[in-house]
């Protein structure tokens, strides 16, 4: 247990930061799931992708996730979107 006043304050501030970070991580996961759900249905939802990219970038800037983690997730989303777009294009051409 913390003995000093500053250690007790640090525990309180860490708890607040933990809640904030947890909330933002949840938001990131939700946005990615929305984008992936649209892609799974064969639709490239530009708005959902943009929101997912934006949320990932903001999380990286705030230090909630590492910038390489954000880049990797964005890249994987883009790959999936490209695959769906090509499949839709091939389907409409055939």
UniProtKB/Swiss-Prot annotation:
InterPro entries: Ribosomal_bS20, Ribosomal_bS20_sf. Keywords: Ribonucleoprotein, Ribosomal protein, RNA-binding, rRNA-binding. The keyword S-adenosyl-L-methionine does not apply. Pfam families: Ribosomal_S20p. Gene3D superfamilies: Ribosomal protein S20. GO terms for biological process: translation. SUPFAM superfamilies: Ribosomal protein S20. Belongs to the bacterial ribosomal protein bS20 family. NCBIfam families: S20. Binds directly to 16S ribosomal RNA. This is Small ribosomal subunit protein bS20.
């Amino acid at each position: 247990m913390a003995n000093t006043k500053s250690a007790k304050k640090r525990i309180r501030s860490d708890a607040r930061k933990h809640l904030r970070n947890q909330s933002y991580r949840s938001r990131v996961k939700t946005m990615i799931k929305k984008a992936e759900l649209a892609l799974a249905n064969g639709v490239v939802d530009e708005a959902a992708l943009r929101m997912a990219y934006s949320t990932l970038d903001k999380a990286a800037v705030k230090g909630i996730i590492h910038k390489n983690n954000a880049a990797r997730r964005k890249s994987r989303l883009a790959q999936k979107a490209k695959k769906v777009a090509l499949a839709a294009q091939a389907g409409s051409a055939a």
